[in-house]
């Protein structure tokens, strides 16, 4: 089991990671591994101490559904992650296009009057993240891909030899 670090107090320091690990070991009947936040407080402003978090047991780094919009912060975090062999998990979305949305545009969202986002928001977010991965050489997993528009970008990244994977939702 690998819980996400989007807890009430973000898992963004070795101390919070070690606390979560101890708590899981004491209460879970299954083996758990911990992910840590990529940025402090998952706010996208300052990267976490990736090396110390790896030493404390983190197996990957993610800000979960929060997009790191500052490309300088993301570039720095991806560079550190690459140097340390760490996996970064991103939620590819363009935050401007996806703000307030709860579903991807389509019949389902329309019939239920759910605030929707164009599939282009995912594609734009993924294209940006993959460009940053190409620049830094980091290992990257695109979390919760939900549109066909994202697939060509992933295919191109794999053809270029980038170390990328994806999950679907």
Task: Specify the residue positions occupied by each region the protein language model found.
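Short, conserved acidic/polar surface loops in the N-terminal third of protein domains
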Residues: 12-13, 44-46
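Short, surface-exposed acidic/glycine-rich loop or hinge patches that mediate macromolecular interfaces
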Residues: 7, 40, 145-148
């Amino acid at each position: 089991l690998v819980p996400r670090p989007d807890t009430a107090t973000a898992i963004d320091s070795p101390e919070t990671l070690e606390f979560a690990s101890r708590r899981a070991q004491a209460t879970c009947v299954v083996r758990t591994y911990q992910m840590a936040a990529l940025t402090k407080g998952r706010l996208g402003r300052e990267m976490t101490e990736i090396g110390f978090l790896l030493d404390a047991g983190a197996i990957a780094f993610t800000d979960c559904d929060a997009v790191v919009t500052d490309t300088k912060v993301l570039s720095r975090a991806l560079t550190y992650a690459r140097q340390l062999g760490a996996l970064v998990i991103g939620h590819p979305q363009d935050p401007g296009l996806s703000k307030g949305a709860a579903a991807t545009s389509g019949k389902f969202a329309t019939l239920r009057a759910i605030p929707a986002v164009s599939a282009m928001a995912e594609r734009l977010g993924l294209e940006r993240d993959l460009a940053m991965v190409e620049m830094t050489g980091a290992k990257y997993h695109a979390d919760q891909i939900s549109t066909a528009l994202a697939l060509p970008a992933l295919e191109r990244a794999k053809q270029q030899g980038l170390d990328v994977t994806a999950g679907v939702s």
